[in-house]
Amino acid sequence: MPSDREGAERRVRTDWRDHPRLVEDVGRLAEVRGGRARVFGFGPAATLAAARANEALGLPGTPTTAVTALMDKAALRARSNTLHPARPVSFARCGRAALLPFLTTLIGYPCVIKPRAGAEGEGVRLVGDAAAAEAAAPQYPEITDLLVEEYLEGPELAVEALSREGRHRILGWTRRLPGPGLTAAGHDLPVALDPATAGAVRNLVRGVLDLTGHHDGPSHTEVVLTPRGPRLVEAHARPGAEELTQLLRLAHGTDVLALAFAAGLGLPEPVRRPRAAHAGLRYVDFPPGRRLAEAGPRLAAARAVPGVVRARLTVPPDTVVRAAPTGGHHHAQLLATAATAALLRSTLDDAADLLARDPRDPAPGRPCRPPRQPDRGFA
C-alpha cells in the first residue's frame, strides 16, 4: 500500500514469499546487522513472513508463535472463551464436510462455518437451518479443517491496537455496517459507547492479545457487542485493511501505520492532527454480467461530491463483472468525511449512486446503495 512506502530511504528488491531469499537480501543491510531495523508485514501472509524474518535476523517483533496463534481460529476461540467462562461461545471443529449438518445442528441455528486458518472472509458462511447446512457441505473439500460456531448477534466493531513490550494501546474502533448475510456494507466512526461497554471491549482485546503472546506490533480485532457482553469474532497480528486505517487517520488523526513504524524502530510518534468529526467507508458492488463502462467519468462524478475523499475501483475498468465478490472483497470503495452523521450518510449515498448507476439505465437517481441498517444498539 502507498502509505508504507512514505519516507523510505532505500528499496530492496526481493521476494518476501521466499523466506531464505528475504532473510539473505535484507540481512545485507548495515542497519539489520547492527540490530537497528525491523521487518514489517501488514497483509495476511506478509505478517507471518515478517515475523519469521525478524526471528531469523535476531530482530525484535511479534514472535511467529503469536502470529500463528491468532491465525488458528479454533485455538483462538478456545483461548478467548476463558475470558468469559460463564457464557462461552459454542464451537466445534469439523474435519469432514459430510459432518457439517450434524455439527451445525449441535451448535444450533443460526451458526457460522469458517475455515480454521482462512483469511479475508473467504469460505465463511452463515447457516440458518438444516437445509442450508446440507447445501453448504458440498462447497468444501471432503477432508477439510473447518470451525462451526454460534452466530454472534449484535453490533460489530473493528478495533485497532498497538502493542509494545506487552502493553496494549487501543488506537480506536470503527462500526461495521452490516450488509446481506455476513458481508459488510461499510464502516463509520466515531462510535459512541457507554463507559462500561467501552471498558469491556478494551479488556477483551487486551486479554486476547495477552493469551496469544502478542507483545509487539499492530493488531486488528473484530468484536460483537452481544447481550451477554463483548465477544471475539477474530483477531490478527496486523492492522486492518488499508481503508480502515485511512478512516482512523481521517477522523481521529491516528496514523496506525506510522505509529507501528515508530514503535517498532524506536522513533518519535507522529503528530496527531484530527481532520473531521465523522468519517465513513462505503463498499459498492456490481451485479454479475454488468459491464463497467464509462468507469472513469462515474469515478470522477463520485469524487466531485463534497466530502468524498476517495473513490476507487478494485477491479479493472471497462470489464464485465463475472461473479459477485466473495469474503471481504468488494468491487469499489468510497471514503468520505462530514461534520455530522446525517451529512456523512447522505454524502456516501449520493456518491454510491453515481458510481453504481448503470449508464444504460435512463432513470436518474435510482438507488444502487446497500440496504440501510439501523444503528443496532449504539448510543
Regions found by a protein language model. Give the residues of each.
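ATP-binding N-terminal substructure of ATP-dependent carboxylate-amine bond-forming enzymes
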Residues: 1-66, 315-320, 326-329, 339-367, ...
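Short acidic-hydrophobic, aromatic-tinged amphipathic segments that line or gate anion-handling sites
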Residues: 10-17, 90-96, 125-128
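Glycine-rich phosphate-binding loop signature in dinucleotide/nucleotide-binding domains
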Residues: 28-36, 105-108, 141-143, 212
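A conserved helix-loop-beta module that forms one wall/lid of the active-site cleft
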Residues: 55-123
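Peripheral (often C-terminal) accessory segments that flank ATP-dependent C-N-forming ligase machineries
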Residues: 82, 261-379
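Internal nucleotide-binding/catalytic subdomain
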Residues: 124-230
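Short, well-ordered beta-strand elements within core beta-sheets of diverse protein domains
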Residues: 125, 150, 193, 249, ...
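Active-site "cap" helix and flanking loop/linker of ATP-utilizing ligase/carboxylase catalytic domains
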Residues: 199-221, 227, 236-294
